[in-house]
Amino acid sequence: MKAGIIGLGLMGGSLGLALKESGLFESILGDDINEMHRRQAIYLGLVDECVRENEIFNCDVVFISTPIGGIIKIIRNIKKLSKNQLIIDFGSSKKQILESIPNHLRANFVSLHPMCGTENFGPKAALKDLYKNQIVIFIDIEKSGEKQIELAKKIFIKLGMNIIKMDSNAHDAHAALISHMPHIISYALANSVLKEERAQDIVAIAGGGFKSMSRLSKSSGNMWVEIIKHNKYEILSSITSFKKELENAITLIENNDFMNLEKWMDNANKLREIL
């Protein structure tokens, strides 16, 4: 079998390394709209060869790991697929992606979301073990072909991932809360510090707490604007919920109600029981 990867950044590049190690494919082809990324992917050994998008779709399995707008555009440009071909997208919100797939090609698609990543981006950020022991969510697979589902499962089990099934509505709501909103909070924290006159001095004394919470603010703005744009309403709902919790904390502090502030914090501690 041949595999093709469109988008050779952190996710696509790491996938290339993992697929090479898996031994499932005789060759792995890649494509990226950024010419430098194409050259870096070859130099770093992420893929065997870089070709153009139309050649990628001659592969048995095609992985699309571009920003969401790019995924939708690529899907709309597909004219035809062979009966057994498998197309996998890595989009981090799903409803708009799934709605863009033509009915006559739907069986070829398995839409999934690997729940892993780092704040780094581009081919140089690729990690061979990025996917190992992580969760991958298979979304709305009841409309995918049986052969496509089985092959997708085989691939990601081989990569050491744990498979969870979910519908697109639940996925997009959950992803907004545990993935998308934390990035926005991290950007907000970073901007709060950067607007101070002596931001560099403040950061110089930062401990683990600040570094942990601000880490996500190093993520690609271009990629995250795409994610937010395509999951806007779920993210706004999550931010509204978070805002209410902040307002609650502000009220407790303003009123010197430290007993209930501690109870508020103790309630948050319960998260440890399910993590």
Could you describe each region identified by the protein language model?
Residues 1-53, 61:
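NAD(P)+-binding Rossmann beta1-loop-alpha1 motif at the extreme N-terminus of oxidoreductases
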Residues 2, 27, 108, 135, ...:
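Residues at the starts of beta-strands that form the adenosine-phosphate
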Residues 24, 44-46, 83, 104-105, ...:
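Short, structured coil segments at secondary-structure junctions
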Residues 54-88:
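Rossmann-like NAD(P)-binding element
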Residues 74-124:
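Rossmann-like NAD(P)(H) cofactor-binding subdomain of soluble oxidoreductases
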Residues 128-215:
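Internal alpha-helical scaffold of NAD(P)-dependent oxidoreductase catalytic cores
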